[in-house]
Amino acid sequence: MVDEATKRTLAAIPLLKTRAGPRDKDQWVGRLKEELVSLIKYVENNKKQDNDWFRLESNKEGTRWFGKCWYVHNLLKYEFDVEFDIPVTYPGTAPEIALPELDGKTAKMYRGGKICLTDHFKPLWARNVPKFGIAHAMALGLGPWLAVEIPDLVEKGIIVHKEKTSSE
């Protein structure tokens, strides 16, 4: 079901061990450290493969994440704000990743710009609790979603590259 490139990407992302969410106070600090190690490794791997496609930061508590993600289509870079909150039931519940500026532009999205991950990603997440974390959500959730949806939205004229809109 998963292609070889995805398997290689997954194998290079460290798995997490601590089963803790924001309500677990001290254990959450440990889980957050594991999350950061995993995210840093994933970003480093992406940079080595010339596949750098997002930046994330969080609030002090590690419960609200935000940043930028981008997708290159026809040699044009499309950049979007990305945000998500860590659910109180995390890691049992995956984060709901949102791209607010795309809200309402595709059927594969919920209100508020939350991308639809129910069919493919959520069952995989459920089988891998607590081993999967934020890096896995980006690699298996947002990355594939961008790869499918952005070219489609561009071809339909729903999103236009920023340089094209400013030069018209």
Swiss-Prot record:
| Any one GO biological process | reticulophagy
Catalytic site: C116
Report the GO molecular function annotations: UFM1 conjugating enzyme activity; UFM1 transferase activity
- Highest taxon of the source? Eukaryota
Matching CDD domains: UBCc_UFC1
Which InterPro entries does the record match to this protein? Answer: UBQ-conjugating_enzyme/RWD, Ufc1
Name the keywords, alphabetized.
Ubl conjugation pathway
Report the Pfam families cross-referenced here. UFC1
Q: What is this protein's function?
A: E2-like enzyme which forms an intermediate with UFM1 via a thioester linkage.
Would you identify the family this protein belongs to, as annotated?
A: Belongs to the ubiquitin-conjugating enzyme family. UFC1 subfamily.
Q: What is this protein called?
A: Ubiquitin-fold modifier-conjugating enzyme 1
Which organism does this sequence originate in? Trichoplax adhaerens (Trichoplax reptans)
